[in-house]
Amino acid sequence: MYTLVLLRHGESAWNKENRFTGWTDVDLSPQGIEEAHRAATLLHDGGYSFDLAYTSVLKRAIRTLWIVLDDLDLMYLPVHHTWRLNERHYGALQGLDKRETTEKFGKDQVQAWRRGYAVRPPALEETDPRHPRFDPRYAGLKKDDLPATESLEDTLARVVPYWNETIVPTLQDGKRILIAAHGNSIRALVKYLDGVPDDVITGLNIPTGFPLVYELDDDLHPIRHYYLGDEEEIRRATESVASQTATKK
C-alpha cells in the first residue's frame, strides 16, 4: 500500500478578500499561516512523515509547504516545484471580486466559470500585464503551454501527465510524498484518481489547510481517502469555499 497526502494551501490574501486568484501570486493571509501550522500539527499527531514534496511555483502553496516542513523538522527534504501544479488559470476574472462578478454576470454564469468542467472563463489578452508570458518564472515554457484561461479539464490535462511521469515513479519507489497545491489542481488529481464523473466533480470543494490522505493499492488505485482534522471544522471550511459567490441579501 502507498500513502499520499494532498494539501491545499492555507487561506491566501485574495481568498480572504474573496477574489478570483488563479495564477496571481498572492501570499498567505494571517489565517492562512495559522492553517498551515494546523496542518503540520495534524500530520505530526497522525504520525505522518515524508521523503519528498511537490508544490507549484506560486508562493501561497510554497509558503504553506515551508511552514509544514519546518514544523515537522523536515526542511531538508527535496522539494520539486512545477507550474503544472499551479491553480487553474482564471483568465480575465483574476483579481475580480467573486460576489460582485456574480451580481454582474449572474449566478449560473459565474458558477459555470468556477465549477464547470469544460467551461473556460474569458481569456486574458496577450497584451494584458497579467498574462503569464510577462512573468519570468514561466520564461522557459513554450508559448502553447502558457494559458490565458483554463477550464478544470485544461488543468487536469497538465496535472495528470506530471502525476504519471514524475510522481508515480517516486511513489512506486516507496517514497512518502506530500503535495502542497491548490484547490483546482487538487480537484483535477482527485477526479483522475477516483474516476469522478464530469458532472459530479463540479460539486467537489477542497478546504484550505486540511491534509487529504489517500491510501493507494499496489496499482495506485485508491483504497480510501480521508481528511485529517475535526469533521465539523472540515465541513464548515468546505461550505465556505462553496459559498464564495453567494450574493449579498
From Swiss-Prot:
Stored Pfam families: His_Phos_1
Site (Transition state stabilizer): H182
Annotated binding of substrate, by residue: 8-15, 21-22, 60, 87-90, 98, 114-115, 183-184
Gene Ontology terms describing biological process: gluconeogenesis; glycolytic process
Involved pathway(s): Carbohydrate degradation; glycolysis; pyruvate from D-glyceraldehyde 3-phosphate: step 3/5
Active-site annotation: H9, E87
Organism: Methanosphaerula palustris (strain ATCC BAA-1556 / DSM 19958 / E1-9c)
Family: Belongs to the phosphoglycerate mutase family. BPG-dependent PGAM subfamily.
InterPro entries: His_Pase_superF_clade-1, His_PPase_superfam, PG/BPGM_mutase_AS, Phosphogly_mut1
EC number: 5.4.2.11
Function, in words: Catalyzes the interconversion of 2-phosphoglycerate and 3-phosphoglycerate.
Keyword annotations from UniProtKB, A to Z: Gluconeogenesis, Glycolysis, Isomerase
GO terms, molecular function: phosphoglycerate mutase activity
Presence of keyword Isomerase: yes
Claim: rRNA-binding is one of the keywords in the record: no
Disulphides: none
Protein name: 2,3-bisphosphoglycerate-dependent phosphoglycerate mutase
UniProt catalytic activity: (2R)-2-phosphoglycerate = (2R)-3-phosphoglycerate
